[in-house]
Amino acid sequence: FIENALNSYCEISVREAGTADFVERITGKRPKICIDPTLLLEEEEWRLLVGSKPIISEDYMLFYSPFPTKEQCSELLLLSKRTGLKVILTTPNGTFRLIHKKSIKYHINVGPIEFLNLIRHAQFVISGSFHAVVFSIIFARPFYAIDGMSDNRVSSLLKLTKMECYAVRPNTIKDPDSCREDFNKAKQIILTAKEDSMLFLKSALV
């Protein structure tokens, strides 16, 4: 069924190499790999959408996870102590408070704009979420991608931008200063990939 459905299309594009491999195995044809739609917009368009005023008035590090663990929260407390930054923890389920400490502040069930605002104005971002990682790159925020090389979407993005060193294993959150890659180089790579993707999309959709 999937093979017949895919073969009915004149052109196919996917976002990750792993997905391209899967489609090629089924159809015998290699699809075009295009960058994620979030990267097709200019950075300034995202900045205008988010706004320049932070919703958190003090310096902070942002931790986002659907299922944060007590071990991760303990590491965040140690990192907060080393850096002097308060931890802003946001999660989509919002049914718990793992640790009650003044240095951890919970922002539960934030909307899309608030989520992007938290990323844009953070001193440091820690997450396993693709969108947290991609917007950290867009806004040039230092970050770590938890288990990043095990996630198809995140690993493809990190490989594309040559930022694999930002991937960390769960429960091994590093110091923010232990890995500093050049965001300008990453953005230049993204610009080239964007131009290539736009050429394909314009051709395929005509």
Language model feature labels by segment:
Residues 1-206:
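Active-site anion-handling motifs in enzyme catalytic cores
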